[in-house]
Regions:
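Basic/polar N-terminal segments that are highly enriched at the extreme N-terminus
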Residues: 1-4
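Alpha/beta enzyme core
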Residues: 6-16, 28-53, 60-75, 85-197, ...
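Generic enzyme active-site microenvironment
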Residues: 22, 81, 133-135, 203, ...
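Short secondary-structure transition/capping motifs
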Residues: 23, 52-56, 79-80, 260
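Glycine-rich beta-to-alpha transition loops that act as phosphate-gripper elements at the mouths
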Residues: 24-25, 80-86, 200-212
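Glycine-rich beta-strand-to-loop/alpha-helix junction loops that act as flexible
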Residues: 174, 205-208, 228
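C-terminal alpha-helical cap/extension of soluble enzyme domains
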Residues: 211-278
Length: 278
């Protein structure tokens, strides 16, 4: 089916204290695994391509077009989202390629500049019917240091959403990007306070470092969109290593990447249950 915008899924998830799953795509096997899991469970899944993935491939279009083809061949409702972009030219390219959601991350800028830049991006995207996510506060780990960043203030977040018109907000509540161990301790009280203060869905970045039970609790407290990348890369890599250990003579990447893709599919299906995904 065609790509969908996240608006309906975000609204349903927020209204019923359920999650919307968002998983990062680095290579085609990721997208195929996510689509397979979405079809098997009937859930909506957000397929995310990050600015870092674009740097790895050297361009956005080849991977984006491949993901669009996967989505159009799928029977599941899939969202194509640009993740953590601070490059406005990249955001515009994503809009031209048919992305149905974009994240513009100006959180490193002073507050007033963050507001102004984000509002401009939101206006441009909304004119095309595309959803916009932004970030306020500082989620740890962007620089490789797994320390929690500056927590998001509910009052400032309310002001920010009103001033920018964004559709969802990534908030800093104790998680950290790129964690390989699931030891993050989330501030559930702050999540609840942000949920009560804001009219837009909350987004949790750095969810790979959060234990299952805490992810479930975070969704119940008011977190909506749950971003997971590193944890699924871990699943893929572990499966590839295990396959090659058992089949040391194999050199065909379809063999070992197929094992990795299957492992990611299985883990995604499990995670969809953990967050009670819509």
């Amino acid at each position: 089916m065609s790509l969908v915008t996240p608006h309906d899924a975000l609204r349903r998830a927020r209204d019923h204290h359920r999650g919307l799953a968002a998983f990062n795509v680095v290579q085609l096997e990721h997208a195929e695994a996510y689509a397979t899991a979405a079809e098997a469970t009937g859930r909506t899944v957000v397929l995310q391509i990050s600015q870092n993935a674009v740097r790895y491939h050297g361009a956005l279009a080849p991977l984006a077009r491949a993901v669009v083809e996967v989505a159009q061949a799928s029977t599941a409702p899939l969202v194509l989202h640009l993740d953590h972009a601070d490059d406005r030219a990249l955001v515009r390219e994503a809009l031209s390629l048919g992305f149905t959601s974009v994240m513009f991350d100006a959180s490193a800028l002073p507050y007033d500049e963050n507001v102004a830049s984000t509002a401009e991006v939101a206006a441009e995207a909304h004119a095309l019917g595309v959803a916009v996510e932004a970030e306020l506060g500082e989620v740890g780990g962007k620089d490789g240091v797994h320390a929690p960043g500056v927590r998001t203030d509910p009052a400032e977040a309310t002001e920010f959403v009103a001033a920018t018109g964004v559709d969802s907000l990534a908030v800093a509540v104790g998680s950290s990007h790129a964690m390989t161990e699931r030891t993050a301790d989330l501030d559930l009280e702050r999540i609840a306070a942000l949920r009560a203060a804001l009219t837009v869905p909350l987004v949790l970045h750095g969810s790979s470092g959060v234990p299952d039970s805490t992810l479930t609790a975070a969704v119940r407290a008011g977190m909506t969109k749950i971003n997971i990348a590193t944890h699924l890369n871990h699943a893929l890599t572990d499966a590839v290593r295990a396959y090659l250990a058992d089949h040391p003579g194999v050199v065909d990447p379809r063999k070992y990447l197929g094992a990795g893709r299957e492992a990611v599919t299985d883990e995604v299906m499990r995670l969809l249950t953990v967050i009670d995904a819509v």
